[in-house]
Amino acid sequence: MTPKTKTKTKTKTKTKTQMKMKLAAITLDCPDPPALAEFYQQATGFEPHPKSDAEFAALNREDGLLLGFQRVDDYRAPQWPDQTVPQQAHMCFDVPDLDEAEARLLELGAGKPDHQPHDPTRARVLTDPAGHPFCICRRG
């Protein structure tokens, strides 16, 4: 009698390489691109894009992300949390100190809606001068 041997068959599964996208830009509609760019430049420290103008202004982050602001005729600010004019998108920024960041942003021209859906020790909702809501969140 000969011993039975198991034959192992290697099966190669071909996996399709998934295309990975890198976020290159975030652009917000607004009535005054240079003014909104100035607000976010002071808030974030991002560098102004050299080709900014009255129709489209932008800021560059060190890693290449562009934060853009495009002029829209008859712009209507989001009415958050009301959905009459929905927000459509919002950004979140990590900050080391919520109270300090909030005070600074309000001084720069941000607004603070009455409706605050988060634990105020973790995150707060503010609005930029064009009415876009954004969050500041405590790191960690």
Where are these regions (language model features)?
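N-terminal beta-strand motif that seeds the catalytic metal site of vicinal oxygen chelate
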Residues: 1-10, 14-38, 42, 88-93, ...
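A short, structured beta-strand/loop element
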Residues: 69-71
